[in-house]
Amino acid sequence: MNIQKFLLKKIHRALLAITNESFFHLIQVQQSTKRKFGNYQINGLIAISKKLNIPIEEFAKKFIQFINLNDVAHTIKIEKPGFINIFLNTKWISNQINNIFSASHLGITPATPKTIVIDYSGPNVAKEMHVGHLRSTVIGDSIARVLSFLGHNVIRANHIGDWGTQFGMLIAYIEKNAQTRFLLNKTIQLSTLEHFYREAKKKYDIDPDFAELSRNYVLKLQKGDKHYRQIWKYLVDISILNNQDIYVRLNINLKKSDIIGESFYNDMLPDIVSDLKNKGLAVTSNGATVVFLENYHNKLGTPFGVIIQKKDGAYLYSTTDIACIKYRCKVLHADRIIYYIDSRQKQHLIQAWEIADKAGYIEKSVLLEHHMCGMLLGKDGKPFKTRAGNALKLKTLLDEALERARCLILSKNPNLKYTEINKLAHIISIGAIKYSELSKNRITDYIFDWNNMLNFEGNTAPYVQYACTRIFAIFKRSKQPNFQLKKNDIQLETEEEILLAICLLQFEEMIVAVSNQGAPHILCSYLYKLSVLFSSFYENCPIIKAHNTHIKYSRLKLALITMRTLKTGLNLLGIKTVRYM
């Protein structure tokens, strides 16, 4: 049930009846922010009345006469200067909420299926994942879940950094050190590889001969040298294994089969360069192959040049990104491509899109979206780091969250078994970390706060999870079979019941907004609001001890729909529920 969509159809018919023109693009229907303004507000009539040269008061009254909401609204009010406030009919609300109880998928209307590629997480090989990867990973995963839930064909793309200069440096360092060559015959930790990388980078920056050697190894890799490809694969496999452990722990739906890293496109790069040359987009400049973009200018005011092949024959990240876009459009046939990557990549990404578009690789109908993410900050307002000033490893963050959750649960439930404490602590800690990320507008920076994250009050995962445990407890005490609930319709008597039911009916329009904007904080705000409304309902409306059997079943039914909605919403965030806390 999508109330906004339902009302828009009614409005469209009314406008056609009044004006013979829809003026539909000028109309907005939104949820009212204050109860005195009803449940929904229609905006846009002022603009239409001006176009028709009719006084707004006269046009608004005429509009109300033509909009057919007799069974839907008990009151329709004109609010100056020209807004229409709609107060929904309680009986209509009851009918719709009863329909949701019987419907599958919470009554959500499936979307017209599109193929949507979501590029997220994308850690670099030979480095441990750190807190900087968290936002892209959890936000991208949540949006993938939401779009799949709506019926879209979602392709999860983990575009890992498994190619390029860093591998030339690593291989050069390994080849020049007998001790490191020996270690390649054993299973080594990713932290050891990262140490190799740091040492290689130091040497690369100060030793021109080592830097030249590293670049030569990059070329050998790109040309398919078997020996160096074997070393490269070993490095990649260790990294993937470690990253998959993090994904499993975070309940992220990224599998090894979702990895389409930079190396995947290597064999396509010669054809990309050749094609761009043939189309007159790429030219030779100082020995390199360059695409000049007229919309971008350097400091001298001349068109900015994007190098796609160096004079030594090596390819660049920009070449890979162009090949990647072509593959997603021409092979995967994407209708929409969403990138959850660093904001610092914005210009680079847009330039690659422009080149791909000029080359004819992107259909006009394809939506390209770069959803930038803000930064995770410490209490000092600076990027969240360790005391030593290094980026905090994601594993370290998860370990600390687990320990904090374990202590919290033990303080509330001292008699719980150790295994139960660990199980609860894992679910609560992961939920708290993910929700803390997902509940913030992805564009803004935010300050990381352990105390707020694990708080059982406010817009947090524990608060929403606790609402679920309350409902579990109600049904455990009531021992009512589902067939009894099916036989009884929901009857809304109190304001608490009505407000809860309306919020439940707004689930679909919220999910559609999340899918369109790629913004899971909208879902978090909804789940928090629903939890608050359920708490008010729980405190003010006796359920098991209701004044008659019909009201008891009605309220149990309303509680069950609430639990289904909360569980579904949390699952779309990648967060699990618990039966007790």
Swiss-Prot record:
Motif 'HIGH' region per record, residues: 123-133
Gene Ontology biological-process annotations: arginyl-tRNA aminoacylation
One GO CC term, this protein: cytoplasm
InterPro entries, per the entry: aa-tRNA-synth_I_CS (IPR001412), Arg-tRNA-ligase (IPR001278), Arg-tRNA-synth_N (IPR005148), Arg-tRNA-synth_N_sf (IPR036695), ArgRS_core (IPR035684), DALR_anticod-bd (IPR008909), Rossmann-like_a/b/a_fold (IPR014729), tRNAsynth_Ia_anticodon-bd (IPR009080)
Gene Ontology molecular function: any one: arginine-tRNA ligase activity
PANTHER family tied to this protein: ARGININE--TRNA LIGASE, CYTOPLASMIC (PTHR11956:SF5), ARGINYL-TRNA SYNTHETASE (PTHR11956)
SUBUNIT field: Monomer.
UniProt record similarity statement: Belongs to the class-I aminoacyl-tRNA synthetase family.
Protein name (record): Arginine--tRNA ligase
Organism taxonomic ancestry: Bacteria, Pseudomonadati, Pseudomonadota, Gammaproteobacteria, Enterobacterales
